[in-house]
Amino acid sequence: MNTISGMSSLTAIGMLTPVQSMTCLMILFVSTAMCLYSQGFVLMGMLYVTMYVGAMAMLFLFMLSLLKMEYTPQGTITPLMVTLLAMCLMPLDITYETYGMVTQMENVTDELVMVGNQLYTEYAMLLMLTGMMLMLSVMGAMSITK
């Protein structure tokens, strides 16, 4: 996971188009969420996927695909750069120890039930307000492009 995270973060910077950069950023967020999930931070891993990949990255991809941006090719990533990157990040991936994805399934369901109860009872109005803000931002992006 560390190698994938490192490669996707550097390719997000080096890509030529914004859509390709956002795709690499989504890969970075998913690999970070998987790393958090495997370390025992189940809730944080799921929130990473929900918040970053599910909402923000899709909104940016939608806006960038509608804006018809012009770009000029600046160059490519050389094979020497990829080799050096792999050599620097490989020791991190070799020393990474996995302890299993899910150790106790009861803890996972208890966390999810607790978060679901909190979101849909106590924070229901804030959740609806956030959904309205997301809908307004999508409508704003659509109106800008017309």
Curated annotation (Swiss-Prot):
Subcellular location: Mitochondrion membrane
One Gene Ontology molecular-function label: NADH dehydrogenase (ubiquinone) activity
Family: Belongs to the complex I subunit 6 family.
Name by which UniProt lists this protein: NADH-ubiquinone oxidoreductase chain 6
Class of enzymatic activity (EC top level): translocase
Keyword annotations of the record: Electron transport, Membrane, Mitochondrion, NAD, Respiratory chain, Translocase, Transmembrane, Transmembrane helix, Transport, Ubiquinone
A GO-annotated cellular component: mitochondrial membrane
Gene: ND6
Reactions catalysed: a ubiquinone + NADH + 5 H(+)(in) = a ubiquinol + NAD(+) + 4 H(+)(out)
Keyword Transferase: no
InterPro entries referenced in this protein's UniProt entry, alphabetically: NADH_UbQ/plastoQ_OxRdtase_su6, Nuo/plastoQ_OxRdtase_6_NuoJ
Function of the protein: Core subunit of the mitochondrial membrane respiratory chain NADH dehydrogenase (Complex I) that is believed to belong to the minimal assembly required for catalysis. Complex I functions in the transfer of electrons from NADH to the respiratory chain. The immediate electron acceptor for the enzyme is believed to be ubiquinone.
Record-linked Gene3D superfamilies: NADH-ubiquinone/plastoquinone oxidoreductase chain 6, subunit NuoJ
Transmembrane segment boundaries: 10-30, 41-61, 75-95, 124-144
Topology relative to the membrane: Multi-pass membrane protein
Enzyme Commission designation: 7.1.1.2
